[in-house]
Amino acid sequence: MKPQNLKVPFFWEERSTEIKDNVLYIPNHYFKHDQFIMPSWEEFFGNNNPISCELCSGNGDWVVSQAQNMPQMNWIAVEKRFDRVRKIWSKMHNFQVSNLRIVCGEAQTFFRHYLKNEILQRIVVNFPDPWPKSRHRKHRLFQDEFMNDVVRVLVESGILVLATDDKNYLVEAIKMMRQCLLPTIEDPYYCKVLDNYGDSWFERLWRSKGQEIFYTEFVKKVGI
């Protein structure tokens, strides 16, 4: 399958949430989420295996590799850019990865409207846009509302991982995580090598430019 074989299943004027070809489409500037009847994830995957989720999936190298290496785990790749979703979808088909599903849409919207409580074993946020300028802070993924949803959708002892090349973004994200989750890494709560992390296109890109990569990992506290 080539990336261009995947087509958006609606015209913009008639946009709505849809599932087609193992992709959940959540359109931008769309607010009728409650009108969509979301199937259970057991139905969507065809099994009741535990579920992990990658946010900011890019071209899909990392999540496809993870799904291949962990066939006992179901994976959700969340990416808002359709050109990148096409590449993930192409890899999923060409490598016959049956335990991967794709969400084409904003991570915040997906978490808020399409995930039930305590559904995810692991959330990995790979190199989110840091939006470094102060006037753009509202666009950052790590906000109070997002963290509330992270805690809600993680199972007990579920894990949240962030990988980033932006030290300032890392520090701010850690402050937010510490308010509701427990760090698994000692103070200063991040490391430069994370065991079993895997390999991603963005990681290779930033390392090739001489950038340091930082990882942090938090676990859901008992009773949250």
Swiss-Prot record:
It is an enzyme of class 2 (transferase). This is tRNA (guanine-N(7)-)-methyltransferase. Catalyzes the formation of N(7)-methylguanine at position 46 (m7G46) in tRNA. Pfam families: Methyltransf_4. It catalyses: guanosine(46) in tRNA + S-adenosyl-L-methionine = N(7)-methylguanosine(46) in tRNA + S-adenosyl-L-homocysteine. GO terms for molecular function: tRNA (guanine(46)-N7)-methyltransferase activity. S-adenosyl-L-methionine binds at residues 54, 79, 106, 129. It comes from Chlamydia caviae (strain ATCC VR-813 / DSM 19441 / 03DC25 / GPIC). Substrate binds at residues 133, 165. Belongs to the class I-like SAM-binding methyltransferase superfamily. TrmB family. PANTHER family: 3-DEOXY-D-MANNO-OCTULOSONIC-ACID TRANSFERASE/TRNA GUANINE-N 7 - -METHYLTRANSFERASE (PTHR23417), PENTACOTRIPEPTIDE-REPEAT REGION OF PRORP DOMAIN-CONTAINING PROTEIN (PTHR23417:SF14). One of its GO terms (cellular component) is tRNA methyltransferase complex. The keyword Nucleotide-binding does not apply. InterPro entries: SAM-dependent_MTases_sf (IPR029063), tRNA_(Gua-N-7)_MeTrfase_Trmb (IPR003358), tRNA_methyltr_TrmB_bact (IPR055361). Pathway: tRNA modification; N(7)-methylguanine-tRNA biosynthesis. Keywords: Methyltransferase, S-adenosyl-L-methionine, Transferase, tRNA processing. Its EC number is 2.1.1.33. It comes from the Bacteria. The active site is at residue 129.
